[in-house]
A protein has these predicted regions:
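Short glycine-rich loop/turn motifs
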Residues: 116-117, 165
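Lipolytic serine-hydrolase domain surface
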Residues: 124-126, 137-214, 232-351
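Intrinsically disordered, low-complexity charged segments of secreted bacterial virulence
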Residues: 1-116, 122, 126-129
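Gly/Ala-rich beta-loop-alpha elbow adjacent to hydrolase catalytic centers
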Residues: 219-228
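Contiguous, well-ordered alpha-helical segments that form the cores/surfaces of helical PPI scaffolds
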Residues: 120, 229-230
Length: 351
C-alpha cells in the first residue's frame, strides 16, 4: 500500500503495511479532524509516505518530515549545506505555477531521503482537467530534483492550471558518471524492478484521488521508460502511457501482451528523437530493458519536429531537449497529457 513502504509502528498505523489502500482510506475517513491531526503529528513518516492516506494529510506530514530532515543535517560540508538549502526550499512558498496571483505551499506527497523518495504534486488537483505523472531517468537524485520540478511546472503554466503534473522519484535511480557506469548502472534492470511495484501502488492511489473524467498520463523518460514499462507488466493504472526517449518497453517486455495495465483502454505513445544516443540500447536482442517501444505494435509513435529556433529536435542534446526547450516535441508531449487529438494526429509518425 505504500509508495515507500512505511515503517511498522504501534497504534493506528501498525497494520498499514498489510492493509489495502481502500481500507487505509476508510480508516482515516472514520476519524475526527482532531484524530487526523494527531495522526499527522505522531506518525508523520507513515502518514507522509503511505498510499491511501488523503493527500492533504500527506503534504502536512511531509512538512514535518522535511523540517526534521533539516534539523538532522550538520551543515558541516558542502553536501550537507546543499541538502539544507533544498529542504528549506521544499518548505517555502512558490509562485502559483497556474499563473493565479499569490504564493502557495509546495505539495510533497512523499519524502524519505533514506529511500531516495520524493514525490511532488505541481498544480491544483481540484481544478485540473488532466494529470500527468513524470518518472525521470538516470542521474536523478533528490539533491538534483529541482530540474524535474521546473519541467513539471512548465506544463502546468502552459495550460493555466488545466494540467497538474506529479514528479515521481520513487527510489534510487542509476547514476552514470563515467563510461563504465553505462554498463554497470544504466543497463542494470534492478532499479526498474525495485521501483515498478511502488509506481503501480502510487498509480492506484492517483486513480482513486483524481476526479472521474480526468485522464491520467504516466510518462517515463529515458531509464524512467523502463520503470514505467515494467510497472505496466505489474498492473499500472493510466489512461495514457508515454515512453519518452525510453531505454525500453520494460524489463521482460517483448510484445504488448506482456503489459497488464489495469485500464483495458489505455493508449500508449512513444517518442525518440533521431540520433538520440538512447537508440543504441533500445530493443537490443536480450537487452535488459525489453523491446523498443518505438517499434511496438499498438504503440503510437510520435515525431519530434523542430525547435522553435528552427533547428531539428535531433541528436544527443534532444534526449533532454525535447522536455525542456520550446519545440514541436514539447508541445506534442503536452498534447498527450491534455488529450489534444488533432495535435497528436499531426505528430503521429507515418509507417
Amino acid at each position: 500500500a505504500a509508495t515507500v513502504p512505511a515503517a511498522v509502528g504501534p497504534g493506528p498505523v501498525a497494520g498499514w503495511p498489510t492493509m489495502s489502500q481502500d481500507r487505509i482510506a476508510e480508516q482515516i475517513a472514520e476519524m475526527s479532524p482532531q484524530q487526523r491531526d494527531r495522526l499527522i503529528t505522531e506518525y508523520p513518516r507513515q502518514v507522509g509516505n503511505t498510499d491511501g492516506v488523503p493527500w492533504p494529510m500527506r503534504a502536512a506530514a511531509n512538512r514535518i518530515n522535511i523540517a526534521s530532515a533539516v534539523l538532522t543535517e550538520t551543515g558541516a560540508d558542502d553536501d550537507s549545506r546543499r541538502r539544507v538549502a533544498l529542504y528549506r526550499g521544499l518548505l517555502g512558498e512558490i509562485d502559483d505555477p497556474s499563473g493565479r496571483p499569490g504564493r502557495i505551499e509546495r505539495q510533497i506527497l512523499a519524502f524519505d531521503p533514506a529511500r531516495a523518495s520524493l514525490v511532488e504534486l505541481n498544480g491544483d488537483l481540484a481544478a485540473a482537467r488532466s494529470v500527468a505523472v513524470l518518472v525521470p531517468g538516470v542521474n536523478t537524485r533528490i539533491e538534483d530534483s529541482a530540474a524535474n520540478t521546473v519541467t513539471a511546472r512548465r506544463f502546468v503554466t502552459a495550460t493555466s492550471g488545466d494540467a497538474a503534473v506529479i514528479t515521481y522519484l520513487g527510489g534510487p535511480f542509476p547514476q552514470v558518471r563515467d563510461p563504465v557506469d553505462v554498463v554497470t548502472e544504466a543497463a542494470d534492470p534492478r532499479y526498474a524492478l525495485d521501483m515498478a511495484p511502488r509506481l503501480v501502488a502510487f498509480s492506484e492511489d492517483v486513480d482513486r484521488v483524481v476526479g472521474d473524467g480526468v485522464p491520467v498520463t504516466v510518462i517515463g523518460h529515458s531509464y524512467g521508460g523502463s520503470i514505467v514499462g515494467t510497472a505496466e507488466t505489474q498492473g499500472l493504472t493510466s489512461d495514457r502511457t508515454l515512453f519518452l526517449a525510453a531505454a525500453g518497453a520494460g524489463v521482460g517486455v517483448d510484445d504488448p501482451g506482456d503489459w497488464h495495465n489495469r485500464n483495458p483502454t489505455v493508449l500508449r505513445f512513444s517518442m525518440t528523437a533521431p540520433g538520440d544516443f538512447i537508440e543504441a540500447v533500445q530493443g537490443i536482442p536480450g537487452g535488459p530493458h525489453g523491446a523498443d517501444p518505438d517499434e511496438m505494435p499498438t504503440v503510437v509513435r510520435l515525431t519530434t519536429g523542430t525547435y522553435d529556433d528552427g533547428g531539428r529536435v535531433a541528436g544527443w542534446p534532444a534526449h533532454s531537449g525535447m522536455l525542456n526547450r520550446p519545440s514541436d516535441a514539447w508541445r506534442t508531449i503536452l498534447a498527450v497529457i491534455t488529450g489534444d487529438a488533432p495535435a497528436l494526429h499531426r505528430a503521429a509518425a507515418v509507417s
